[in-house]
Amino acid sequence: ARWCQWYAEEYRFEIEVLTVDPANRSGENVQNWARKVRYNWFKERAEALGAEYVFTAHHMDDRRETFLMNALRGSGLIGITGMNSVEIIRPLAHMDKAAILDYAKAHELPWREDVSNQSLKYTRNKFRNQLAPVLYEVEPRWMGGLKKTIENLERDRDLLLGFMSQWKSEWTETSGEEVLVKM
């Protein structure tokens, strides 16, 4: 956060930093709790500023990690495709982290990575720092293959949700809290 504050001051743009105490998480996993707090705060700030969207820097590597974690938990199509929200825009979601870093280096853009990304205390970091190298050793093309799988499943999810929405509008009607199926 200090580096971000310095950067904002150096380049003269506004920044707001949320400081929270993880002791308030009621035993919930720190990473999950922090994500919920962060996204709730993004939503609150967007509403306060009258913003329709929040942009994040999630990239394809993040999506692969999310996919693998959700798949191993037994998630369904909606859960396994992850990171889907109307309000959140992820312009880098289809780019590999390496490509983003190459771009930053080529254009002399400063880059900082949170030191917690190396800590094996967090499940996501175990995927990133331990499982990913093994997958690369077993199948060097795994990143491209998993990217294609994620994109195919997202397309299937969107198609299925579209069909469900169309069916619902054609074959159901709402009466108070009841949903009635037309015969």
Locations of regions flagged by a protein language model:
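Core alpha/beta nucleotide-donor-binding catalytic domains of modification enzymes
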Residues: 1-133
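AMP-forming adenylation/ATP pyrophosphatase catalytic core
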Residues: 20-24, 37, 85, 147-183
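Short, structured loop/turn "capping" segments at alpha-beta junctions
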Residues: 110-112, 141-146, 160
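Internal, active-site/partner-interface "lid" segment
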Residues: 117-125, 143-154
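Conserved anion/nucleotide-ligand pocket segment
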Residues: 129-146
